[in-house]
Every structure is written in C-alpha cells, then in structure tokens.
From Swiss-Prot:
Species, as recorded: Histophilus somni (strain 129Pt) (Haemophilus somnus)
Annotated protein name in UniProt: Alanine--tRNA ligase
Entry GO MF terms: alanine-tRNA ligase activity; aminoacyl-tRNA deacylase activity; ATP binding; tRNA binding; zinc ion binding
Family annotation (SUPFAM superfamilies): Class II aaRS and biotin synthetases, Putative anticodon-binding domain of alanyl-tRNA synthetase (AlaRS), ThrRS/AlaRS common domain, Translation proteins
Keyword hit for Repressor: no
Note on cofactor: Binds 1 zinc ion per subunit.
C-alpha cells in the first residue's frame, strides 16, 4: 500500500514520463494576483499562461500544489474537523497542457495513471465518470477510446440555473477562458451511503470525486457568446488526500497516514485517549495550513491574510484547550509535520525555527485571554433564549478577548446555538472593515490593458532609443491618436523605460518627435507590453508613429542608488537578525527606499547601528555589481534570494554584489556599490504583527538628511544653553529636576487630599448601617480622588464612596467599596452605572473602580442614579 508521499511522487513521475515539466508548488501567497487571498488551485500559478499574458519554455506541466481554503470566497474553515474531506490546507495534483494535447490524451493519461498496475492499479469497475451533457467528444473518448461502459458514464447538464452553469462546466470568471470538464469518481462500496453524481443522494460519501479534468476550449465574451480558443488547453486537479484515502482503503481523509501520525502526536501532547475526537482532526488539519502559511511569509495580524492565519491558529488552540492542553502545544507539531510531508516539507524545514517561534508567541498571546473569554461565553450561553447568542456578546468576545467570530460559532455549534450575526455586524462598525480587509482581493482580472505583441526593453544598456507607437489608451479606451493636453498610456515596440517592478518605481522622461512632446510620469507593465503614462504637451501622437524615447537619467540614477542599497540592506538584515528575515514589501524611489520584512521582535538600537555600518562597509568596498542571466534552478542553487510578490520565469536575471548579496532582480542598479556614496537609516517601526519597516536614504539625500539633523541638534543645544556634546547630560538633568518637582507636587496634593478627606467624612450619610458618600468634588485629579477614597474607607469602616470631578470637558468618576460589602455592591458595576449617565464607561476591582465620561452637564444625573441605586440595594 502506497504512502501519501509515494502517491505524490508517483503522480509527478508518471506525467514526467509523458513529457511534462515538473514545476515546484508556488507560494500560498499568490504572485501578482490581487483577485486571490490564497493559492487555492493548481492552475493559479499558470493563470497568465492560460490568459495569454505569459509564456513558458514548456507546453506540458505537472505540479503538486499546496492550497489553502479559509477566508474569502473559498472558505472551508467552519466544516474542518466535522466532515471527512474538508481541510484548510490540501495538496492538488495537476497536469496541464498549454495548447499542446487536448481531450483524448488528457483522458487517457488519467485512466492509465489510475488503473495501470504499474501506477495506482485501481479496479476499473470501481470508477465512474461524468461529462458535460453536450460534450459528445469526451463521452466518445471515454466509451470507445478507453472502454468505460455506458452505465459508468453520466452526462451532467446545466444544473445550476443558467446556461453553462453546471458542475461539469468550468469558467475562470464571467468572461474569459472556459469549457466543459469531465470528473472521475471512485465507488467506496455499498456499505457507504450515497448515490451517483446527479442523483438525489449524490452528497453522500459512497461516490467520491477524485479527479477533475477541465477542457479550456472557449472564450466567453461579455454578451455571453462563446468563441473557440485558437489553442485549447487542459487544466486538471486531483486532491492528494482524497486519492490517498482511496489507495489506503479508508473512507475519511483523516484516516490516511499523514493525518494519523499528526493526530497521534496531538493526542500525546494533550493527553486525549479517544483518537476519534473531532478536536484532534481540527488541530491536525490546522497545523498544516498555519505552518505553510508562515513559511510562505504570512504573519499573524488583524487584517487580510494575517487575520485568516490568526483565526486558524486560535481555532486550533481552542480545540487544544477542549482536549485538556495545559501548556503551549501547537508549535510542537511542526517537527512531526515536516517528517510526514516528506519532500513536500522542505520549505517548512528551511524556516522551522521561525515557524515554531511565531506559533508559540501567538498561542501564548491568545492563552492570556482564552479562559476568561470562554468563561464569559459559557455564562452567556447558559442564559441564551430561543437558541440565539446575541451579536453584542459575540462582538465583546472578538473585541476584548480576541475571539474570531468563527471560533465563537464553533463553541455555539457544539451546543446547537447560533449567533445573531446581523447584531455582530452592527457592533463591528469600523473594526469590521479592518477584520474583513480580505474583501480588497476582488479586482476584476480582465480589466487590464490587453495588447497583441510585446515591448522589447533596452533600458539595461540604453537611456534613449527610437521606437514605434503600437497602441494608445485614453480614458481607458484604445484610440488611434491623442492631442495636446490629453493624458494617456502609450505602448511602444521598444523602450529604454523601466516599468515598475520589484518595488522599483517606473522611469520618467519624455517621448519626442518633430513638433511633438509627451511627458512620461510613470511606466507600468501590462502583460508583455510597457505602458508609458503621462500627458501630451505639444502636437499630436498617433499609433504607428516613430518617436524617440528619452529617460530622465537623473531620476533613474537616484532610483538605482536606492535599489542597490536595498539589496545591501536585505543582506545586512539577514546577517544581523537571522535568516528568518524575508522581504514583505518594498518601495524604491528616487528620494527614499522602504523595506518591509518579517521580524517577530523589535530591533534594538545597537542592531540598527550594526546593520547601517555593515551596509556602508560594503559601499566603501566598492564591489562590482555583476548581473547574469541563468536558469532559475541554477540561480537558487547559488543562493540567490527571490523577492516577495514577484513572479519569475524559467530564466532569471541575477544581481550580485561581491560575496555579500545575491538576488533575483530585474531592476536598474549601479555599476559599483561605491556609487551609492552613503546609506543612512532614517526610520524603523512596526507596521503589523511580526513585520518591521526600515526607511533609508542614500547619496546626496543622505548627506542632506545628516545636515538637517546637525542643524536640529545645534538649535536644541542653543535653546538649552548647552553645547552639542553635553546635550544628553543637560536633558537628563532637566528630566531629573522635573521628576523631583512632580513628586513634590504630588505629595502636596495627597496631603491636601487627606485633609479634604477628613472634612468630607463628616458629610457621610448612613443607609442600613453603611456609611455612604456620593459627591462632586472640584479641582481634583484622579490620583487625589483615589487617595481620598482609600482614606475614607479606613476612617468609616463599612462604607461606599463615589466621587465625580470635572476637568475641562471631561468627567472622572471613582468608586470605592469596603471589602465587607463587595458581595452585594461591586465598585465596577456601580461606576459603570454612573458612567453611562455621562457618556462613558469604565471598570476595575470590586473594591475600587474608575471611569471617564464626556458629558459634564449630566453629572447631577449620575449622582442621583448612584444614590437611588444605593438606597435600593443596601
């Protein structure tokens, strides 16, 4: 019986033997595709190839693609652990044809791999296939070409309420490539409930889809017309976990070898004896998605991809709590995961220390609020009426205790209670927009400039070339000419202009001809062509016209200084902080460089100095900057670093600076590092959980910055009547003096407050043997109020004291209760009751609590409400 790792390798070996290029799994973070939150299918990395926007050196490919479906449109999170086949992370085995073979070979390849004794050897009688109702060609290949009996072939029509809306018709979107598909199902046997595809019992588990083969043969236009594609293609997908369950003779994906080893480890860590417990499944699934997402550069945070990761981690931790985990456990699964994933675990293994560290930190952070949040939820669930938990409680759990809504829903589901999601949404307001930041991943991919042909880039060696205008776009539409004053996008057949990529902004300059000038403000790449964005200053510009394209060399030179310095900075960060540092984003302009990178902890000042010194050391070394073009595998073998969010072809450009830095990069660089002159870090900050940002300047800009800082230093010294060398000592003296004065002032305030307390004690009234003081005090700060409250509690014995004071437009409230009364009068509840009257809220201990408000005009109302409550409850 084959292991999952052996099945994965067999699939790749089979298609390699059929002339397919084995392509590594792409990152779970889609490259340059804003329409996707996570990679969720094998075809994602080939999307531009299918759309005709990219070319590869091969026409046949095969992959074992890592996928995540959690968050966004494809969200399996709530079902994970409760069904046999839902996962947040899975592997999709796929074979692809880019205008090469089509239906006949695709079908025969699939059948051979599944049934041949040399490969998987499945019994033919256990397999059923579906085809699109009108796809007679596929039906004929299955029946006559392969020999599948007619009673094992099922035609599926438009079963989703519209033309071409079918389980057996695939489309990339409302427009674009689409076509019929054929699916292969495995029959688990009569002992499992379920019916054939298309029957009323099709949702059962007897007949399970294992392979989907899509025939991309049409291009759907906006009016619904189907045009035949000139080069039909094939896109297939087979879930590795599903086919492993078939081969290993089990009906649930969670019973295959990978999951059984993970489940056993979870049980060991938590002490759980029942290996069928669904919480074990949840955790075993979630460690896969979490570890691979972190390895691919996602950091837990409160927005976008990072928030989805945080939700998955917290769901796993909550299920660990259910199993009885007393300590951090989740990160301890990483070594087992690496082992069971075999060769597919190499990416996690390379970043194992960082993956484990981030998982541990996230679990520790959530553990601080988990038990208190669960206690609040348990109390709320006891009081639930009509089987619905209020949105207000769900929001409080989210806002105060860090419970994602689906985690709360998970707990409610176990008790057959649903959440008032509309109420939750109302409470979310602005915070909902942040937590749902994934919604920004919704750009229509078809809304791009599509132009036949390519633009040849001459900019590595030239700053000026002669070129022909191949297309013009004005106000989003293709036009034949533009006039002076109009802003447009100009497409050229050749260009020296660098198009924005890899964080480097696009070149500026001008396009000129006799009596014509077009000022280029930016350059962008659209598929295989370069768009020169700007305004026509003089004359007219026509498609087909020959012009001179001239780059602004001063702008480019300043930009190249910053780009080369960014490479040196990246290398220095990895040397000083560790190899876990990975680029998360960058901006390289003519004025500044900005570099965002994974770093779970704050950077110490001495580390920043070391990084800066290291960069300047390699600038002074005046390394030759060498660029080479080579196969991507060779580049990676040499240690070249790839940049986050960039897409690379089979052949790449490598930029090397001495032995210090080597990266894949298509950008413009200096010839020697000495040209950078000077590198100065001007800012370092956190921009998200686990992500830091460094901003720096170079060359003349760095000198200007240092001169400005020197001027500020001298002005500050003059103001403090000191010299620059003694400035720190002078400031320290002033701070010490200010602290001493503040301490003396506070002592005077407390002394005054103690005296005031003695006077106030005389105004206490008695309610059923309890001394009560409810007053507004003037000219008192919060610290003084607390001193008075503590003093009065000591003086009066059994007492409740409530004070209100006004400072400008703000209200401060302090309530104190002697410990003998806290069972029936809680300071936190009473201060909140008062705060509600003045537009505020607060809290604290049962014996001492504070609150603030913004409506001083309602102070008398707050005092009245407090008095009434005390008369009623004492």
């Amino acid at each position: 019986m084959k292991t999952t790792a052996e099945i994965r390798q067999a699939f790749l070996d089979f298609f390699h033997s059929k002339g397919h290029q084995i392509v590594d799994s792409s990152s779970l973070v889609p490259e340059n595709d804003p329409t996707l939150l996570f990679t969720n299918a094998g075809m994602n990395q080939f999307k531009d190839v299918f759309l005709g926007l990219d070319t590869r050196s091969y026409t046949r490919a095969t992959t074992a693609q890592r996928c995540v479906r959690a968050g966004g449109k494809h969200n399996d999170l709530e079902n994970v652990g409760y069904t046999a086949r839902h996962h947040t992370f899975f592997e999709m085995l796929g074979n692809f044809s880019f205008g090469d073979y089509f239906k006949q070979d695709a079908i025969k390849f699939a059948w051979e791999f599944l049934t041949s004794p040399e490969w998987l050897g499945l019994p033919e009688e256990k397999l059923y296939v579906t085809v699109y109702e009108t796809d007679d060609e596929a039906y004929g290949i299955w029946h006559k070409g392969v020999g599948v009996p007619e009673n094992h072939i099922i035609r599926i029509g438009d079963n989703k309420g519209a033309p071409y809306a079918s389980d057996n018709f695939w489309a990339m979107g409302d427009t674009g490539p689409c076509g019929p598909c054929t699916e292969i199902f495995y029959d688990h046997g009569e002992h499992v409930w379920g019916g054939l595809p298309g029957s009323e019992e099709e949702d059962g588990d007897r007949y399970i889809e294992v392979w989907n083969i899509v025939f991309m043969q049409f291009n759907r236009l906006a009016d619904g017309t189907m045009e035949k594609l000139p080069k039909p293609s094939v896109d297939t997908g087979m879930g590795l976990e599903r086919i492993s369950a078939v081969i290993q003779h089990v009906n649930s994906n969670y019973d295959i070898d990978i999951f059984q080893k993970l489940i056993a480890k979870v049980a060991e860590l938590t002490g759980e004896k029942d290996l069928t417990n669904k919480s074990l499944r949840v955790i075993a699934d979630h460690i896969r998605s979490c570890a691979y997402l972190i390895a691919d550069g996602v950091i837990p945070s409160n927005e976008g991809r990072g928030y989805v990761l945080r939700r998955i981690i917290r769901r796993a931790v909550r299920h660990g709590h259910l199993l009885g985990a007393k300590d951090t456990f989740f990160y301890k699964l990483v070594p087992v995961l690496i082992d069971v994933m075999a060769t597919a675990g190499k990416d996690v293994k390379a970043k194992q220390a960082n993956v484990e560290k981030l998982l541990r930190l996230e679990e520790e952070q959530f553990a601080r609020t988990l038990e208190r949040g669960l206690a609040l939820l348990d109390e709320a669930l006891i009081n639930v009426k009509d089987g619905v938990l209020s949105g207000e409680v769900a929001f409080k759990l989210y806002d105060t205790y860090g419970f994602p809504l689906d985690l709360t829903a998970d707990v409610c589901r176990e008790r057959n209670i649903r959440i008032d999601e509309e109420g939750f949404e109302r409470e979310m307001e602005v915070q909902r927009l942040r937590a749902q930041a994934a919604s920004r991943f919704g750009v229509d991919y078809n809304n791009v400039i599509r132009v036949e042909g390519t633009t040849t880039f001459e900019g590595y060696t030239e700053a000026e070339t002669q070129a022909k205008v191949t297309a013009l776009f004005y106000e989003g539409k293709s036009v034949e000419s533009i006039s002076a004053g109009q802003s447009a996008v100009v497409i050229l057949d050749d260009t020296p202009f660098y198009a924005e990529s890899g964080g480097q902004i696009g070149d500026r300059g001008c396009l000129i001809a006799t009596n014509m000038r077009f000022d280029v403000k930016d350059t962008q790449k659209y598929g295989q062509v370069f768009g020169h964005i700007g305004t026509l200053i003089q004359g007219t510009l026509n498609v087909g016209q020959t012009i001179n394209a001239v780059v602004d060399t001063e702008h480019r030179t300043k930009t190249s200084l910053n780009h080369s310095a960014t490479h040196l900075l990246h290398a220095a960060l990895r040397q000083v902080l560790g190899t876990h540092v990975a680029q998360k984003g960058s901006l390289v302009s003519d004025t500044i460089l900005r570099f965002d990178f994974a770093q779970p902890e704050a950077i110490r000042q001495e580390q920043l100095f070391e990084i800066e010194c290291l960069v300047n050391q390699h600038i002074r070394a005046n390394h030759l900057v060498v660029t080479e073009v080579m196969p991507i595998d060779e580049a990676k073998a040499k240690g070249a670093m790839a940049l986050f969010g960039e897409k690379y072809g089979d052949v790449v450009r490598v930029v090397k600076m001495g032995e210090f830095s080597i990266e894949l990069c298509g950008g413009i660089h200096v010839k020697r590092t000495g040209e950078i002159g000077l590198f100065k870090i001007v800012s370092e900050s956190a921009i998200a959980a686990g992500v830091r940002r460094v901003e720096a300047v170079t060359g003349e800009a760095a000198i200007n910055w240092l001169q400005q800082q020197q001027q500020i230093l001298m002005q500050s010294a003059d103001l403090l009547k000191s010299d620059a060398n003694s400035l720190v000592e002078k400031i320290q003296q002033l701070q010490d003096k200010a602290k001493k004065t503040e301490k003396e002032l506070q002592a005077l305030k407390e002394k005054s407050a103690m005296k005031a307390g003695s006077d106030i004690a005389k105004s206490a009234v008695e309610i059923n043997g309890v001394s009560v003081i409810v007053q507004q005090l003037e000219n008192m700060d919060v610290k003084s109020l607390r001193v008075i409250v503590d003093d009065l509690k000591n003086q009066l014995g059994s007492a409740v004291i409530a004070f209100v004071t006004k400072t400008e437009d703000k209200v401060n409230l302090v309530v104190g209760v002697t410990t003998d009364l806290t069972s029936k009068v809680k300071a936190g509840e009473l201060v909140n009751l008062m705060a509600q009257q003045v537009g505020g809220k607060g809290g604290g201990r049962p014996d001492m609590a504070m609150a603030g408000g913004s409506q001083p005009e309602n102070i008398s109302k707050a005092l009245t409400v407090c008095n009434e409550w005390l008369h009623k409850n004492l």
